[in-house]
Every structure is written in C-alpha cells, then in structure tokens.
Amino acid sequence: ESDGSWLSSYYSAEENSLKETNFSSYIAVGLWHHYLNFSDKDFLEDFWPTLDKAIEFTLSGQTEHGDFFWAKDSGDWLDDSLKTGCSSIYMSLICYKKIAKELKQSDRVSQKQINSLKDCLQKKPQRFDRNWESKSRYSMDWYYPILAGVLNKKDSLKCLNERWDEFVVEGLGCKCVKEEPWVTAAESAELVLALSRLNLDEKAKELLQNTFNLIDEDGLLWTGYVFKDKKFWPVEKPSWTMAAAILAGNSINRFSPSSNFFNF
C-alpha cells in the first residue's frame, strides 16, 4: 500500500482495510534471508524503498511502552498488542538494520526503539492481550520470543522447559493450541528452529522427524493431525507449512548459507 503497509488479505470477497504491523515489517526477514543465500546486493537495492516504507509504517504503531499496536483499520490503530506479532517485529527490525548497514543506507530504526520493544516483551506481560482473551494457550506465544531472539539463552531454556509438556506430544509434534488434540506441522517446524537456536540439536532432530510423519505420498506436509481421531485436518497442504519445514531442515542439516539464520 502507499503508506508501506500490507493488508491482512488480498483475496477476500469483502473490502478489507486491516493492516497488521507484523505483516508489513516481515519483508525485512525475507530479504535478509534471501541475501544470505544468494549475496545479491542488487536485489536488496531494488527492494530497499519498499522495505524502508514498510518499516516506517510499522514504527508508527509503536506505543510509549515499547509494544506495537497489532493493526490499523480504516485509519485507526486497534488498541491491543500480540506477543507473537511483536516478537516477529523485533526480528524484522534487526534484519532491517542489517540490510541498511549492508547497503550503507540511512537507518530509521534506533536501538532505543528495539530495546524498548525487547524490554516490553520481557518485562511487561500486561501490555499484551489487553482487550481480548489471552493468547497464551497458543504455542506460538510460547516459543516465538525464543525463536525471534528476544530472550537470552538462560531465559529461553527456562521458558522452553516451563511449558514443554503443555504443547509437545511425545512422538507426534507440537500442538497449535494447548487444550486441543491437534499437532501442526508449521508450529512443530518453528519449534525446531527455536531448539536449533539453542543448540539443542538432538531434541530438534527428533521433533523434525516427528513432523515429517505428516508427509503424504506426494511428499507434501498436511497442516496438522488430530491424534484423538487419528485424522489429518484440515484437508490441506499449504506452501507456508512446507516452507517452515524446509527452514527447520536447513537449520539442522546446514545445506545452504542461511542455515544459521535464526542464530544471530
């Protein structure tokens, strides 16, 4: 969009004006990942104006407490913040700064803004889920601060161990929602990335192998498996699930220059 934002969807039958802050900034992560793989500086240069504008939009949603409003709709900020979304933004801002440094471009993100976000994620739980039901039942809220580098290793291990048994089903994978008998490939693969970041390689390999049990005869991953009913559900095999699995496999097997992407 002209203000640097990305709409939450582009294929809806209804008119959509919802612009999520973490969606807009996440282009930084994709661009830096691409650069680590291909060292294509021209590609970065071409996308710099788009990236810079996207980050400008996201930064406009940061509150005085350090967190980011989760979205803007019809020109107004929606008054709540997501732990997973803000963790994603944290990683995006770091990638943006790396790109700016590589291209010798002016950097609109101050370290103070990043530190403020990090401090909020670590010490101000009251800033998240202020006006809706807590998202803590979702596994992404558990492992994303680890995956995105918000927590140091000691705190990451503490966080990991505290809720491991709530979300991880032995021999199957990671649940998407704590109380549901449903393991999902994308969440399992992302948790592999978090484990790899902490150098918990054996645990990561075991979880990745369990994730691959969701592969069908065509070599594609089902979204998830309802172990209570012994059924794959939903009946879909989305590209983003496969992308998460490829990233997870790369973090363990080191088959591309970006294999340590989540270890910075």
Regions inferred by a protein language model and the residue ranges of each:
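Short, polar/charged, Gly/Pro-enriched helix-capping and turn/loop motifs at alpha-helix termini
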Residues: 41, 65, 103, 218-221, ...
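Aromatic-rich carbohydrate-recognition surfaces in CAZymes
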Residues: 1-62, 86, 208, 235-253
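Amphipathic alpha-helical segments of tetratricopeptide repeats
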Residues: 36, 98, 165, 212-213
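Acidic-glycine-rich active-site phosphate/pyrophosphate-binding loop
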Residues: 2-6, 64-68, 165-169, 217-222
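CBM-like carbohydrate-recognition segments
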Residues: 5-7, 153-160, 177-187, 193-197, ...
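Short linear capping/connector segments at secondary-structure termini
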Residues: 7-14, 69-77, 175-176, 225-230
